[in-house]
Structures are given as C-alpha cells and as structure tokens.
C-alpha cells in the first residue's frame, strides 16, 4: 500500500478528486496518509478532517523557506509518505525538499507546459489567444513548473469562452489527469529519457530511435 502526502494552500479541489478516486478504486493500492497546509484557514484542511484523514497545519508565515520545508518533510516522513502530491500548494519548494523525495513529488499546472508557467495560467492562455489549452502533471524539480511531464490533457478554447468558463473546463481535466499520473508513477513502470517521461513498455522503441 502506497502512502500519499497531500500539500495544499486553499480549497484543494484536486485533493478531493484524488481522495474520491481512491475511494472509488480508480487509484490503485494507495491511501492518503496525511494532508498538510501552510495556511490555517485553508478549506481543504477542513475537508480532510471531515473525511477522517490526518490533517496538519504547518504555518509558513514569517518562517524562512527551508525551515518551513524541514518541518513539512519531517511530517511527511513521520506519516510514511512515499509520494507527495501538490494540490494548489502555493509555495515554491526548496532544492533540499525536492532532494528528500527524488521523482516522488507531483504537481499539477493548469496549462500545457512549457507554455504559461506560474500564476494565473488560465488567464495567461486566454489573453494570449491560444486555441487549445489544458493541464499538465509533472515531477517537481528545483525550478518552477519545470520537471518532466507525466500526463497532459487538452481543452479547446471556444469562441464563447471567457476566463472563468475555460478555467472550469480545465479543472475537470485536472481531476482526470492527476488520477492517471498517480497510477502511472505508483506503478513504477517508466523511465525518463532526457526530459521525456516514457512508459517502460516503450523504452526499447525509444532507444532504437535514438
């Protein structure tokens, strides 16, 4: 059984989607070991407690980043987390944090990376006038929205869209993408070739093409 650690700063809709997928058997051989927020008023923490999950608040305000990260890592390890999922966690992890969980930290971003990294990605995409947007689940590394891409889902930008309607449709795909990515990573049947995330069944073909 794999133990997931969830980090969030807000309502945690992707956390809820992960929890629902576990309960429904769509995520295999996994449980949520702990939910951690850096904000005491995060609605996601209330939701976690209502679901009977271990839920911790480790405030970040006024603390150096690495000091806070060490407290979070200690809590994750105490609860046996072997995969960390960021679900609207509005903190940039320190290199030290990332090194504690190599290829074991996932993030979801509401754009087709590498396009539109950072905050308000949906608004960036809409303002730029792209015809297709979407979401990306990727490994977390030392740079912002940069790690190897695991899963992407596309969403057409309709002529009738506004920023809100586009964001809602992207969020629906986020929930599907995170479940898919977690299953792939927990299965362990993958390799990273350069920057490419490749399922192991495809490795021979990739090596032949190089």
Feature annotation, model-predicted:
Residues 1-210:
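One-carbon transfer enzymes
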